[in-house]
Amino acid sequence: MGPTLAVPTPYGCIGCKLPQPEYPPALIIFMFCAMVITIVVDLIGNSMVILAVTKNKKLRNSGNIFVVSLSVADMLVAIYPYPLMLHAMSIGGWDLSQLQCQMVGFITGLSVVGSIFNIVAIAINRYCYICHSLQYERIFSVRNTCIYLVITWIMTVLAVLPNMYIGTIEYDPRTYTCIFNYLNNPVFTVTIVCIHFVLPLLIVGFCYVRIWTKVLAARDPAGQNPDNQLAEVRNFLTMFVIFLLFAVCWCPINVLTVLVAVSPKEMAGKIPNWLYLAAYFIAYFNSCLNAVIYGLLNENFRREYWTIFHAMRHPIIFFSGLISDIREMQEARTLARARAHARDQAREQDRAHACPAVEETPMNVRNVPLPGDAAAGHPDRASGHPKPHSRSSSAYRKSASTHHKSVFSHSKAASGHLKPVSGHSKPASGHPKSATVYPKPASVHFKADSVHFKGDSVHFKPDSVHFKPASSNPKPITGHHVSAGSHSKSAFSAATSHPKPTTGHIKPATSHAEPTTADYPKPATTSHPKPTAADNPELSASHCPEIPAIAHPVSDDSDLPESASSPAAGPTKPAASQLESDTIADLPDPTVVTTSTNDYHDVVVIDVEDDPDEMAV
């Protein structure tokens, strides 16, 4: 092929001023084939990089967003400027309009400057990931990374726009393309080279030196997993090789540009045309190298490349799978946003409907310990401190109260009702006539038509008092009459089936306040028959159901007949034995009751629940 003359048309190109250089035909053919290969590898390789990042979840990270951006920048020259270069090489000159020449120069500038700026962004991303790993997630979040990407391309456009003046981008017959005419303004040319090439090289070099120092300092097999360390080193090497190849490919043309811009008259005739051609083609060839480097050095990219190659055998399935992957990714993002929104709404509703803290009001009840609590192994009862109210105990009281038999009393026929209590009983014949019962450390509740006592002490004046500890299924206890005029101090024992009188005297309790009639309402009588001593002569002897106790009975034989020979003790033994088996483990404390029946012939059955919060009478 002979030398191609410049097109004699007013296109304002360098070819109109400079003659077309005479290249050997073999060199023209070689350059043409190399450019075709560059275009094919550029388009296919960078497309595969974009598909690999899109399809592989391991490659979907903020750092690879700049890798995709770099692939897009490399593809720009393969779409428009390189095909027009092939056209100029085939005809031996430029026969297109000046507008197309300006577009070729502008797109070429976007590709070159965009590539170097994206390489800088990749280096900064790797630097933050390795040297500032704690702040990496905050600095390079998805939102921030997208903002950085937009800023990168805005800077690229702003850097290329000054070259769009008419006359600065012209056709160069030595390279068969439209480039920036550095002969028109040498100062501007040096400034562009420093901003577009030298400064990015310094930034990227600093980042990779720091990264390499950090990697060498962290190469401790005992402190880090060797596999993770090797992966980081390979990732670093991949990015470093890409930077190194870019610097090597674009360094010759930038050096020639600066030399010609500084001394155009001296250097213009000394630089051969083939050197210009080789420098430009090396720079163009860099656009297809990035995809090859990813496939050679990055295992994830290499594996995804093989997947794409195998899928290319069935294009329909491949593109349908790609579309489905994109839809799944969009659905996953939508679902993630919906879940986050629902979670935020649930938290707001929980805060709005949060129940206030339950405040427990302490009971104003003076706890008086029962005698023998400390000896029986109940220090909490003997200490006098109330137990905290709990829902479990309330539930127990509620369930236990449903099984309890109502407390009843038999009044004598003459009176028909109980006489109200008015202080202590009057002492007669030197014997105490008051009955003092120390309640357990809680308020005393009388079940079923009875009075609720909350005083420090409770004084009873019935003929006899019987205590039965409550269980989960309490058994009824039938009250019995005690003959009038008898008085005794009875101590209940598990060893005997009936109480025996004792001659001991108990001094009435004086340390507690004496209740009055106003403190204790008049109890209601029950619907049971009211037997008297005349109707039931067998009840003249004092006896009660056998309740297990702790101490042995000691009684006075002169006042009461022998209970063992009493005929009334016979019918009570079966009930007592059954009650003893049910309550021997539940009776907490020995209870001593002093009774006197000078004025009343009533019998009161007291039902005591073995509950830490109440005692039912």
Swiss-Prot record:
UniProt's post-translational modification comment states: Cleaved by CAPN1 in a calcium-dependent manner.
Encoding gene, per UniProt annotation: GPR50
Q: Which membrane topology term applies here?
A: Multi-pass membrane protein
Q: Which SMART domains match?
A: 7TM_GPCR_Srsx
Task: Give expression by tissue.
Answer: Hypothalamus and pituitary.
Disulfide linkages recorded for this protein, renumbered to the chain, are C101-C178
Q: Which PANTHER family match?
A: B2 BRADYKININ RECEPTOR/ANGIOTENSIN II RECEPTOR, MELATONIN-RELATED RECEPTOR
Q: Pfam families, per this entry?
A: 7tm_1
Protein family per UniProt: Belongs to the G-protein coupled receptor 1 family.
Quaternary assembly: Homodimer, and heterodimer with MTNR1A and MTNR1B. Interacts with KAT5. Interacts with RTN4 isoform A/NOGO-A. Interacts with TGFBR1.
PROSITE patterns noted in UniProt: G_PROTEIN_RECEP_F1_1, G_PROTEIN_RECEP_F1_2
Entry-linked Gene3D superfamilies: Rhodopsin 7-helix transmembrane proteins
Q: What induces this one? A: By TGFB.
Q: Does the keyword Disulfide bond apply?
A: yes
User: What's this protein's name?
Assistant: Melatonin-related receptor
Q: Where is the composition biased (Polar residues)?
A: 485-500
- Entry function: G protein-coupled receptor that plays a role in numerous physiological processes including regulation of energy metabolism, neurite outgrowth or cell migration. Promotes self-renewal and neuronal differentiation of neural progenitor cells through activation of the NOTCH and WNT/beta-catenin signaling pathways. Modulates the KAT5-dependent glucocorticoid receptor signaling by modulating KAT5 subcellular compartmentalisation.
Q: What is the superkingdom listed in this entry's lineage?
A: Eukaryota
